Amino acid sequence: MAGLMVSGTQVSYVGQSCREIPEHLGRDFGHFAKRLDLSFNLLRSLEGLSAFRSLEELILDNNLLGDDLVLPGLPHLHTLTLNKNQITDLEYLLDHLAEVTPSLEYLSLLGNVACPNELVNLEKDEEDYKRYRCFVLHKLPKLKFLDAQKVTRQEREEALVRGAFMKVVKPKASSEEEKAAAPENQPQYTPLPSGSRDLTSHRGVLGKGRYFYYGRNSEGNRFIRDDQL
């Protein structure tokens, strides 16, 4: 089937312009898939994801997922990337993730309004991003990596003391921003040709300090784990 790639326990359905998770994916692969990549689609809902109960990694970059995002209980999920979606309500998302993904250790939200950094919004600065990290770690203290940056001991300590006071206020969208967020005004990304895509490769978003790269051809945010350092 065009656009579908399966390698062991890894399933990739990238760049197919689907607005919902195809039923056949859950029926055919949900019982064994541990890594699912649905990036570069038009997803607004994750209905159907409940068929993938054994997921450990979920890549949802470059979709249209917003503040009504609902995930099923995924007790084994340790990696979640939601880069370049339409998420603005950080606190709601974090509370939801704390409830349904208790094993989560790697999270990336780059390219969402909920993740303030200068590459997305020139009105934000490094201090805004630090406060965001502090609040996220307060809500999800088990995280080891956030937005491709390793969580430091200092950040953990600060989150324990100050995290509850670092809430990032949800911005009010202007009419111009709402118009720009409409699907017809979203850029159309073209994924890598299937022949050049390797499901076992580790492409992704690398960050050092305050600067980030999240490319249009990224297959999903890949994190460097402790055993790779």
Swiss-Prot record:
The keyword Iron does not apply. LRR repeats lie at residues 32-53, 54-75, 76-97. It comes from the Eukaryota. The keyword Kinase does not apply. InterPro entries: Leu-rich_rpt, LRMDA, LRR_dom_sf. GO terms for biological process: melanocyte differentiation. Keywords: Differentiation, Leucine-rich repeat, Repeat. Pfam families: LRR_9. Gene3D superfamilies: Ribonuclease Inhibitor (3.80.10.10). Residues 121-162 form the LRRCT domain. Residues 174-203 are annotated as: Disordered. Required for melanocyte differentiation. This is Leucine-rich melanocyte differentiation-associated protein. It comes from Mus musculus (Mouse).
